[in-house]
């Protein structure tokens, strides 16, 4: 079994089948940020680095982030994810809501919830003020596939979410996303915003790909790829014509 590896002081990550999740320890509790996809024994893995009691927060409800949730009696999640969690992915368990600007106190260490909608309605990341970084989530990657296909994805909301992050970018220098490159500079946020706007405006040509046995359209914006519904190509071309 892969174990947790140190990310920075009292913070670790675990690679789990193409996705990573995180563990952040304070003086009284340790926060598990997502649970991966393969059902890793998280309590056993965490015991190798901390004896503190564990609590869980999910950055969003996609199954590659909730695969080990059954190991916890309760979890924390933005309420906009609860319908997806229970009704689409049929997950169970007690869910406690977390909202924008909520603070998770681990004992002399606090992580703030930042809402970044778009990839999913209730996607969040955790702001570690003391270490000037964001931990977890899918909205920001380098050389990754950002999934924007399916009924609960929204590219316009994604732009809004990243613009919200950009407004707060003086508070952090680095992002530790759940996929692709481990450490991403905050300076990529404007590039992602512009890339998403270009896709919405029909300025980026897409190519058809098969992902998880589904045909999607891939828009390459140099630093990333947005994977969208096939109908996105037609919609974007129509919107692009409106600007001609």
Say what each PLM segment does.
Residues 32-35, 53-64, 76-81, 116-118, ...:
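Active-site neighborhood of phospho(di)ester-bond hydrolases with catalytic His/Asp-centered motifs
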Residues 37-107, 142, 195-205:
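Active-site HxH/HxHxD metal-binding segment of metal-dependent hydrolases
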């Amino acid at each position: 079994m892969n174990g947790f590896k140190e990310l920075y002081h009292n913070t670790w990550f675990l690679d789990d089948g193409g996705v990573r999740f995180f563990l952040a320890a304070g003086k009284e509790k340790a926060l598990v940020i997502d649970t991966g996809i393969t059902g890793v024994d998280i309590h056993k893995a965490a015991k190798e680095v901390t004896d503190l009691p564990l609590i869980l927060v999910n950055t969003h409800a996609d199954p590659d982030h909730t695969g080990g949730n059954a190991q916890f009696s309760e979890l924390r999640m933005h309420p906009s994810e609860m319908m997806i969690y229970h009704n689409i992915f049929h997950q169970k368990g007690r869910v406690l809501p977390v909202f924008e600007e909520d603070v998770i106190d681990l004992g002399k260490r606090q992580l703030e919830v930042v809402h970044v909608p778009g990839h999913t309605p209730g996607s969040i990341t955790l702001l570690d003020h003391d270490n000037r970084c964001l931990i977890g989530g899918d909205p920001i990657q380098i050389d990754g596939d950002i999934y924007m296909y399916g009924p609960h994805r929204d590219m316009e909301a994604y732009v809004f979410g990243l613009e919200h992050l950009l407004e707060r970018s003086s508070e952090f220098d680095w992002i530790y996303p759940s996929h692709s490159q481990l450490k991403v500079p905050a300076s990529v946020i404007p590039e992602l915003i512009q890339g998403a706007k270009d896709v919405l405006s029909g300025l980026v040509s897409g190519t058809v790909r098969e992902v998880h046995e589904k045909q999607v359209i891939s828009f390459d914006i140099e630093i990333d790829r947005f994977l969208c519904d096939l109908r996105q190509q037609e919609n974007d071309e129509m919107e692009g014509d409106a600007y001609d």
